[in-house]
Amino acid sequence: MKKLVQFLLPALLFSHAAFSQEKTFPVDGQVIDAKSGQPLNGASVFCQNTTVGTLSKEDGSFHLRLANGGYDLIISYTGYETQTIRIGKDHRPADSLRVQLKEQDKSLEQAVVTGSTEVADGWAKYGQFFLDNFIGTTPNAAQCVLENKDVLKFYFYKKRNKLRVKATDMLVITNNALGYKIKYQLDSFVYYYDGNVGSYTGYPLFEVLQGSPDQEATWKQNRLYSYSGSRLHFIRSLYDSTLDEEGFVLELADSGSNRFKKVEDPYNAQLYARDSGDVEISVQGRLRVSYTSQAPDKKYLIENKYPLTTGVQISALDIVNGFVIEENGYFYDQADVVNIGYWSWKKLAELLPYDYLPQQ
């Protein structure tokens, strides 16, 4: 077990009051076959990156109740294309959702792997590499267990010097450091060796583990440690206009140069606009985020050859065209925002669900 930093930030514990209120909204719907119109029994329906999910009933119906905020609702069924629907308190259908799933086109799947070779001993050759770039190399990652590595398939594209990893079923990861079991529907994992650039996308569903009182206390401390300075912590602080109190400092890259200039007022009308329950951030380019309330993990400093005396966590976001934040810390469009620096080092092993609250 990694050594814990023994601290509790009062501002952190009592921040984000809007999200901590017990306000919820319902989501009802039915999952059917797009071609026949027949209901699909047992379809997986969940809000990605949360602990909230269910299975459709015999008539295809489902019901969820969600805390106010934004979510990506994921609907999947074996042999069918997964569907994603963005929902929230202020943008959801007035009536019940009717989700029509299409059967997967096997010919398209075959075309995807054309020009590649499935590696027969893929796990032996690339397994640890995959874990390092998917789960991470943090101290918490050492306490994560991939329960079903047999569902992974590894493909190597010689002409492009690219590795692609597929999963034939949801990955199951037990995070013994944070006390979660994660079911992860892997959408894409690719790594380009020529540029040493990789990325992965997918849909995680969290299940809170049950443990002894000592385990529960340890998990609570570890979750707080992972949350402090995280992207989720930053996004919520930006939403709440509490960046300074929470220990965040922002700098924006000057266009055409690598120089950064401190953002003196992150809430000015040119950058920050509140509309009903949403906050729109109008930033393009690279935004550097420093977290001054907690030092980086020593393992990160050693791996990246930074001085061990470094006392500030430095991350950055490459932003295509701004983004919109909802009160639980969900934001969109997430595909247009890329992590750099400390946040990019903290991968799945540090991930917390949107329904996590520091005071829990």
Explain the meaning of each model-derived region.
Residues 54, 81-97:
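Structured interaction patches on ligand/partner-binding surfaces of diverse proteins
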Residues 27-33, 60-62, 99, 111:
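A short, amphipathic beta-strand motif
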Residues 1-28:
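Bacterial Sec-dependent N-terminal signal peptides
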Residues 43-47, 73, 113:
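Hydrophobic beta-strand segments
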Residues 50-61:
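Short, acidic Ser/Thr/Gly-rich low-complexity loop/linker segments typical of extracellular
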Residues 25-27, 34-49:
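Short, ordered, surface-exposed loop/turn motifs in non-cytosolic proteins
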